[in-house]
């Protein structure tokens, strides 16, 4: 094949399957194996109704994705027409696309926790008070409504073909599946420093004030380290999973749509000048400060920790306090 033909081949989009379709059997097998592990070592890690809800979330998300896939593809191809360059299907382009797509996911994921409109869709993934591989299946039914796909459009505008972007996005999703487990504690420090791991992602699913809105990474934890959103798992503080205001129900439709219902109620009842705030400000925001956001919860916790620390120091320095013996 001549040089011109090779160059043309690199520019022609290949037929790429959805890698997630091929990973589903492995997902099922790993969930089964984790269930066996939990039955022997930690029976409380799985709750039948919770697991069934997670499976229903996954099924519904698949159906919703199939319904909206055509519209997302059409918009992606339309944006691709106005690309700044044409990036070939070369080995280096695949690596660049994978890394940049993971950064786009970080931006999306961080936004999904900081803007209530996007949180209304993403909250589905955090609604379980258990943390196991079935939790990974809790994907949104309303991602298209929330416009989450917009965060990948800049890659196509830059010149990556939509087929490449969707394929590496599938790989990203596959990677994130296995980190939803408590069966694995920690990896070697070099791996924990670069990659997202079960330990890092457990932090992300926590409701503890120390951990709220941290570790947004998909594959590479370096984004959190770079942008100040990384927090390590602390062994002496057990993680509490779920959302700040727990649902207290396994009702599937309520689990899927409860935050959208909450937005509608708040927008309807809010003063005119504050209506948009209930869609675009952080979850928990109110115009009168009557509810907590993750920031106010963390600030109150930090103040409490500082007070405990100062009280402890004052007690140790007080006259008559027992001083520790020198080594």
Enumerate the predicted regions with their spans.
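Loop-to-helix transition at the N-terminal end of transmembrane alpha-helices
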Residues: 18, 22, 45-62, 93-94
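Residue-level signal for inorganic ion chemistry
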Residues: 34, 55, 223
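Membrane-embedded catalytic scaffold of the fatty acid hydroxylase/desaturase
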Residues: 59-68, 87-240
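Membrane-interface helix-loop junction between the first two transmembrane segments
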Residues: 32-52
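Cytosolic/stromal cytosol-facing helical appendages immediately following the last transmembrane segment
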Residues: 130-134, 181-327
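Short, strongly hydrophobic alpha-helical membrane anchors
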Residues: 1-18
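Membrane-interface helix termini and inter-helical loops of multi-pass transporters
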Residues: 76-86
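Central hydrophobic cores of alpha-helical transmembrane segments in multi-pass inner-membrane proteins
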Residues: 26-38, 72-73, 98-104
């Amino acid at each position: 094949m001549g040089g011109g033909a090779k160059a043309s081949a690199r520019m022609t989009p290949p037929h790429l399957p959805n890698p997630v379709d091929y990973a589903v059997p492995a997902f099922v097998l790993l969930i089964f194996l984790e269930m066996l592990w939990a039955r022997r070592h930690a029976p409380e890690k799985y709750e039948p109704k919770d697991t069934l809800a997670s499976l229903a979330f996954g099924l519904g998300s698949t159906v919703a994705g199939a319904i909206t896939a055509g519209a997302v593809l059409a918009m992606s191809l339309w944006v691709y027409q106005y690309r700044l360059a044409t990036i070939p299907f070369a080995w280096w382009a695949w690596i660049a696309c994978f890394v940049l797509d993971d950064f786009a996911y970080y931006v999306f994921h961080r936004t999904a926790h900081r803007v209530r409109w996007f949180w209304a869709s993403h909250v589905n993934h955090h609604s379980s008070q258990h943390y196991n591989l079935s939790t990974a299946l809790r994907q949104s039914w309303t991602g298209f409504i929330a416009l989450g796909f917009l965060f990948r459009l800049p890659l196509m505008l830059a010149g990556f073909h939509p087929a490449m972007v969707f394929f590496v996005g599938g790989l990203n999703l596959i990677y994130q599946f296995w980190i939803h487990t408590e069966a694995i504690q920690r990896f070697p420090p070099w791996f924990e420093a670069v990659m997202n791991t079960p330990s890092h992602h457990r932090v992300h699913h926590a409701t503890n004030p120390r951990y709220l809105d941290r570790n947004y990474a998909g594959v590479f934890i370096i984004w959190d380290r770079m942008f100040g959103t990384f927090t390590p798992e602390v062994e002496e503080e057990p993680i509490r999973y779920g959302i700040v205001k727990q649902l207290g129900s396994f009702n599937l439709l309520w689990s899927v749509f409860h935050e959208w219902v909450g937005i509608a109620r708040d927008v309807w009842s809010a003063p005119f000048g504050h209506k948009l705030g209930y869609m675009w400000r952080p979850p928990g925001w109110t115009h009168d400060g009557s509810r907590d956001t993750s920031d106010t919860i963390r600030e109150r916790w930090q103040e409490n920790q500082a007070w405990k620390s100062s009280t402890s120091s004052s007690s140790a320095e007080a006259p008559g306090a027992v001083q520790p013996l020198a080594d």
